[in-house]
Structure formats: structure tokens, C-alpha cells
Amino acid sequence: MWSEKLIELTKDEAYEGSMMKKSNGKFGMIKSRGVESIEIVAVELKDFMPVPTDKVIAQYKNIDEMISDGWVID
């Protein structure tokens, strides 16, 4: 699905505020990344810039679970 390089980049650099892309073409932004949880929220465009909303679209226990579900850094 995704290249090993992109998966490793996601593991190293995907933190709060990172834009994410899912394998189905959906976009989101990491709202929080803690030791045991990652929360991705929907984004909306304002003045051509993606802005996070309060709508949670995905939650995971860890980065590997998130990547397995198809999310990587954009």
C-alpha cells in the first residue's frame, strides 16, 4: 500500500498538527498523539489552508495501528 520510506517517515514525524492521508483518499490532521492514543480530526479549508475541526474521524492505540488502517503523513 505505502512505501517503507513513507511508513518510517510517518513513525518518526507524525505528531500533533501533522496532515495525514488515508489510503482511500481521505485527509485528516493529528489532534493528539500520546503514549497510548492517537486522535485524527477532520479538516476544512479556510483561505486555502487546511484547518482542524473538532470532529474526530479516527482513534488508535498506537502509530502501527494507525498505519495498518491506511493513514500516513501527507
What are these language model-derived features?
Residues M1-D74:
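Terminus-proximal functional modules
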